[in-house]
Amino acid sequence: MRSNNNNPLTRDEILSRYFPQYRPAVAASQGLSGGSCIIDHDTHRVVLRRHHDPDAPPAHFLRHYRALSQLPASLAPRALFYTPGWMAVEYLHGVVNSALPDADELAALLYHLHQQPRFGWRIALSPLLAQYWSCCDPARRTPFWLRRLKQLQKNGEPRPLRLAPLHMDVHGDNIVLTSAGLKLIDWEYAGDGDIALELAAVWVEDERQHRQLADAYAARARIDARQLWRQIRLWHPWVIMLKAGWFEYRWRQTGEQQFIRLADETWRQLRMKG
């Protein structure tokens, strides 16, 4: 269901107009941030998500809704409702662990996603990295950051090994173990891109875990494991810069200390690797 109202409504207006029998249940839970909440009525539970990024155009939030509308129930929560500034999606009942599933399970989940029809919009990292630079705290801009950004822009993004729909924020807190199996939540960064970019961006603990995931995926997708790992490594500098820039971006938006700590740690990793 999609509303044509062009003026963003408050949460209370959304509830009274479209979900009059529902009440807020939990302030924050699975993949929620920026004023989103869980609402319920009897045994029915819905996630009400708010467009919380003031620097992102409304079209990005609409893409999030469209991605959920396209995906099968075996991968993601169902999209239920959209109006400018808000969407409602199915609440997934299940277990969320901070740790990733084992390599074979995660490879199967990602391969299932990558077999779906493309969303229709490409993920472009170069303009995103430039946006993070321009929107960050000017006091945080360093010559090192600018050099790395210009070097990546000069080299250009790696040529895709295989294009597919991507989630692009795969970590333990965004994976729900439901009665029907593993599913992914928080699809706001989804788009079409290289499967190796997705694998490069998974929030792994170390290189050993990363190699295990890459090998498991290669076996399932019938791709040469060495070729896939080389492609993942080509994307690695882009992904590290993406994470550092995102932490800086969120620090500027929220002022939350966790983001500045994560940004500092990511910059240290980049400097250690030259």
From Swiss-Prot:
Give the domain of life.
Answer: Bacteria
- EC annotation? 2.7.1.89
Which pathway, metabolic or otherwise, does it act in? Cofactor biosynthesis; thiamine diphosphate biosynthesis; thiamine phosphate from thiamine: step 1/1
| Pfam families linked | APH
Q: Which UniProt keywords apply?
A: ATP-binding, Kinase, Nucleotide-binding, Transferase
SUPFAM superfamilies for this protein = Protein kinase-like (PK-like)
Q: What GO terms describe the biological role, i.e. biological process, of this protein?
A: thiamine diphosphate biosynthetic process; thiamine metabolic process
User: Per UniProt, what is one GO molecular function of this protein?
Assistant: thiamine kinase activity
Catalysed reactions, as listed in the record? thiamine + ATP = thiamine phosphate + ADP + H(+)
Record's function text: Catalyzes the ATP-dependent phosphorylation of thiamine to thiamine phosphate. Is involved in thiamine salvage.
Record-stated family: Belongs to the thiamine kinase family.
Name of the protein this chain belongs to: Thiamine kinase
